Amino acid sequence: MKEKKLWGGRFDAAPSSLMIRIGESISFDQELYRHDIEGSISHSRMLRRIGILSESEQRKIETGLGQIKKEIDSGKFEFKIENEDIHMSIESRLTELLGDLGKKLHTGRSRNDQVSQDVRLYIKSEMHSILILVYDLLTVWLKKAEAHTKTIIPGYTHLQIAQPIRASHYFLSHFWANVRDFEDFYSAFERADELVLGSGALAGVNYETDREYLRKDLNLARMSENSMDAVSQRDHIFKFLFASSQFMVHASRFCEEIILYTSQEFSYFKLPDHLTTGSSIMPQKKNPDVAELIRGKAGRVIGNLTHLLVMLKGTPLSYNRDFQEDKIPLFDTVKQIKICTEGIRDMVEGIQIFPENATRSLRNGFSTATDLADWLVSAKGIPFRSAHEIVGELVKHCSMKGYDLFTIPSGERGQIHAVLTDPGYEAAISLETSCDKKDVFGGTALPRQKEQIKRAKAKLNELTKKLKQIESKGKKTI
């Protein structure tokens, strides 16, 4: 005899095999079991407070839910496709354990508000883990910057050598981008920190549900304002996926730089062997696979965001079965963000820099041409447009003759313009001087780098406090 569905009273026929296969979500939403049990325990306590359950009944339900958690933890729990999802799987097992008492648990609750609460609890829990990983990455960026305040590397625009920068400036540029990522992930935590239980299917519930008790017991910051909004929106998932997509764009751009800068054509950086792989046919190869894989995963995470946006855009209020698909991109993104953050951290820690190769590229790329033009303006009183033209002629001559600004003979410089033979020429094209002339707030000058590192340390202290707030706001998730 087929097992009757928990919602089957209205139906004469059981769902077809196809309906069961297309409708099941237990193959993926079992990820929520801890949070579903956590919410159910709080719900049972609330039912006791309002007189639906006796104290003895509530204790039995809580004990039963604890046993189910142990069964799932140990791998002994049998997930059945016929039970559709994690909510029905747990309730069905609870009914096996407790008989009709298990059927009382769903009083004053719909799967619509139940799943919405589960996902919020899941996001809160995972945000804590992700924020710790991003924080660790920030400390590595800062440590790398501190070690390379005097190392000069090329800065690029249009993938053409533009101006010299201190390597610390480069590493700090990624530090500040990831600071914003941390803050956006923190904001995603706050968006999920909400009680939606008590919203029912969409209109609320017919019982005197004590939502304030539920909020406190689940350690949530606030209650949802509108039951229809609570069960039909997925902004809490959007918020996380937006933050994740931005993080992965930042990560992918860094990975692209690693791929370029570790190639033979650049050779500014070198990755340690344990973060690279070889070729099955070419024995000389040392491939930056971690960087390439993370770059590829960026498209995957952005695709997860697109998946959810497109899925939701055509659905009327309130709940629709389409929403079952919201968890696949969520779970996958959590997994990808965690492993990619670790990968970026390990690459940053392991990068070896070759300043001599960077210097060669800076010289060959005429990276201080702008500084030379500015020197003609400030020291020699030449109008900027005229100075720009003089230096442009000099660069063209060097390119044709195989010189750079450092190797072209004084006599040949004088053929272009007499001012280029001035003794101040050498200082004007100095790589270090070029960096230190950028003595503005946020610039690459050495004093400004030291200031920026100090501010970065202060920012880390600020983020440390936010991590502690997360720990105090987070539920113990059973």
Swiss-Prot record:
Pfam families to which the protein is assigned, alphabetical: ASL_C2, Lyase_1
Family from the record: Belongs to the lyase 1 family. Argininosuccinate lyase subfamily.
SUPFAM superfamilies: L-aspartase-like (SSF48557)
Organism: Leptospira biflexa serovar Patoc (strain Patoc 1 / ATCC 23582 / Paris)
GO CC annotation: cytosol
MF terms in GO: argininosuccinate lyase activity
Disulfide pattern: none
E.C. number: 4.3.2.1
Matches recorded under CDD domains: Argininosuccinate_lyase
Organism lineage: Bacteria, Pseudomonadati, Spirochaetota, Spirochaetia, Leptospirales
Pathway(s) it belongs to: Amino-acid biosynthesis; L-arginine biosynthesis; L-arginine from L-ornithine and carbamoyl phosphate: step 3/3
Name the UniProt record assigns to this protein: Argininosuccinate lyase
